[in-house]
Amino acid sequence: MTPDVLKNIADTLEARREAAPQSSYVASLFHKGEDAILKKVAEEAAETLMASKDKDKLHLVREVADLWFHTMVLLTYHGLRPEDVVMELHRREGISGLDEKASRKPTA
């Protein structure tokens, strides 16, 4: 997989964000709003956990793909792109997880 795949998916998601809800599954998710998107992300996360527990690698890969996709829908809903997440990962690269967590500002 190349980064182009993530960019292409993100571009498609952005195009579907303002599309008529009956035009596609993703457009209908955007139309239903954040709660529907969050529900789908949670559902895919749970399915990912179950696939892991089942030790079924192919099923796990497919569920992670679903989870990534729906997480990208959530990012698009908030006007974000995969590049924003990649930049954050670059920022954290080489930093101890404990140090990184300690450096975060508390959220209200």
Curated annotation (Swiss-Prot):
Its main location: cytoplasm. It is found in: Cytoplasm. GO terms for molecular function: ATP binding; phosphoribosyl-ATP diphosphatase activity. It is an enzyme of class 3 (hydrolase). The keyword Ligase does not apply. Its EC number is 3.6.1.31. Keywords: Amino-acid biosynthesis, ATP-binding, Cytoplasm, Histidine biosynthesis, Hydrolase, Nucleotide-binding. Pathway: Amino-acid biosynthesis; L-histidine biosynthesis; L-histidine from 5-phospho-alpha-D-ribose 1-diphosphate: step 2/9. GO terms for cellular component: cytoplasm. Pfam families: PRA-PH (PF01503). CDD domains: NTP-PPase_HisIE_like. It catalyses: 1-(5-phospho-beta-D-ribosyl)-ATP + H2O = 1-(5-phospho-beta-D-ribosyl)-5'-AMP + diphosphate + H(+). One of its GO terms (biological process) is L-histidine biosynthetic process. Belongs to the PRA-PH family. This is Phosphoribosyl-ATP pyrophosphatase. The gene is hisE.
